[in-house]
Amino acid sequence: MKGLSSLINRKKDRNDSHLDEIENGVNATEFNSIEMEEQGKKSDFDLSHLEYGPGSLIPNDNNEEVPDLLDEAMQDAKEADESERGMPLMTALKTYPKAAAWSLLVSTTLIQEGYDTAILGAFYALPVFQKKYGSLNSNTGDYEISVSWQIGLCLCYMAGEIVGLQMTGPSVDYMGNRYTLIMALFFLAAFIFILYFCKSLGMIAVGQALCGMPWGCFQCLTVSYASEICPLALRYYLTTYSNLCWAFGQLFAAGIMKNSQNKYANSELGYKLPFALQWIWPLPLAVGIFFAPESPWWLVKKGRIDQARRSLERTLSGKGPEKELLVSMELDKIKTTIEKEQKMSDEGTYWDCVKDGINRRRTRIACLCWIGQCSCGASLIGYSTYFYEKAGVSTDTAFTFSIIQYCLGIAATFISWWASKYCGRFDLYAFGLAFQAIMFFIIGGLGCSDTHGAKMGSGALLMVVAFFYNLGIAPVVFCLVSEIPSSRLRTKTIILARNAYNVIQVVVTVLIMYQLNSEKWNWGAKSGFFWGGFCLATLAWAVVDLPETAGRTFIEINELFRLGVPARKFKSTKVDPFAAAKAAAAEINVKDPKEDLETSVVDEGRNTSSVVNK
């Protein structure tokens, strides 16, 4: 693989060569401008209003300038692509430290969602919350939040997330990633007041629905921003950091809830304090995001090339000519990728995600990939405290188990970073599902026994499930859903995929509530059989349909999908996404300077088209 320094040196040599050519010969554009001036004296229009159109680049006497320029830009893009693919991790960190830092900052917004969704499930096991909002179970003598309200509260925040995700698409199109995130943080800070001053489950439902809207925004933009602002060598780490933020949020929630159980067991602060702590995040995050660079991919799609260049400069370390050349080559690569996608369709709408076979396949894979987080039984982990209580452990022990579980999840995500150097995306996804299935079947078997040891064993194995989930499918999904879509449709595809997840999550939540609640199905640990089966079904889909994207740049992934390469052959298939563009450049019919030159003429407020004969 060609090194980054040699790549920059070749670029310098080409620039020096062009300067020599300009000094030793007459520039073709200058020659033609003289000719145009002579023609203007004989014509009726004012040459001061003449504008060149997109195709009006004039070749030199050898008829080589246009192909050379196109081929050079394509070569720069290809070399930048090769450099990105072969860049070691430490080189990437030294070259893009600012990009990594900005990505970490933006992804930290997900801590809030992981925190709030975790405390909601933990409230169902908190005695003061149960007595305040629950009803007495005549069979057990304990207070419980009814299944209907548990389902309703879950549906409310998921409905809010669906609405928020759909609003994110047009908002990003209009104002970009940064200002959309800042606006979402502002609204979240306002909506938390409803939760803090709640007087009934109805108020909590309204607060959850409204808070779900900014959470939906965070779900989409953290992943897309990380994938677009960082190079391939950092992409897995910074997209899967989203999962780490979820785990941190859940761990914070478990620690806060254990504190509430110990210190505020009979006080409203037991649930008000966890709500109030959410105000810690919005202001500092909004200030940080305000100073973050906008995604250069979004800026190029909007035609703001100069701003995209400045954004790239802010993500790279170093200074001087070498940095400028690296920025130029990276910009060429982004423009080439987007131009190739735009040739397939001029617009980037939700309909484009499904209207043709290529994008329909990519959207399907992204949706089913994220749905896998539901169908693998991971939602049972979110209700772990409630599950542990139903398994027969004390409330205090249940909260302790939850803390251990989330710590294991964080450790597993870090291990997945190490494993990603040796395993592909598909490998982590598939092996994680296989191990989860085994653990769930064992949990189901233990659920058939009423002994204390069996109950404790099922609770301990749920921690093992959480470990394998956060080692495999949980983090890798965040990377896959950012790599599978085209750059032009990335935000919209992620929105559709996450909303597919949210819709299925509604069904999964209802099932879990019925499986665990003593007044309904009361399956308890036996629900492991159910989720073990769904893990195997999800694994079967992955084997057939989920491609391996590890080590592939965005433009390579585009080409693999364009060629219709089967999922299991993605890893071994070699492609040259620049070959077609090179061929097109070589076939350009360059006109002789003596032939007609078509230009666009703007004459005194009206547009006309003229052919100037030289």
UniProtKB/Swiss-Prot annotation:
Q: Which residues lie on this side of the membrane: Cytoplasmic?
A: 1-108, 166-180, 224-236, 294-364, 420-427, 482-493, 548-614
What does the record list as GO biological process?
A: alpha-glucoside transport; carbohydrate transport; maltose metabolic process
Family label: Belongs to the major facilitator superfamily. Sugar transporter (TC 2.A.1.1) family.
Gene symbol here is MAL31
State the conditions that upregulate or repress this gene: By maltose and maltotriose. Repressed by glucose.
What name goes with this protein?
Maltose permease MAL31
Where exactly are the transmembrane stretches of this chain?
Answer: 109-129, 145-165, 181-201, 203-223, 237-257, 273-293, 365-385, 399-419, 428-448, 461-481, 494-514, 527-547
Organism of origin is: Saccharomyces cerevisiae (strain ATCC 204508 / S288c)
Q: Which Pfam families match?
A: Sugar_tr (PF00083)
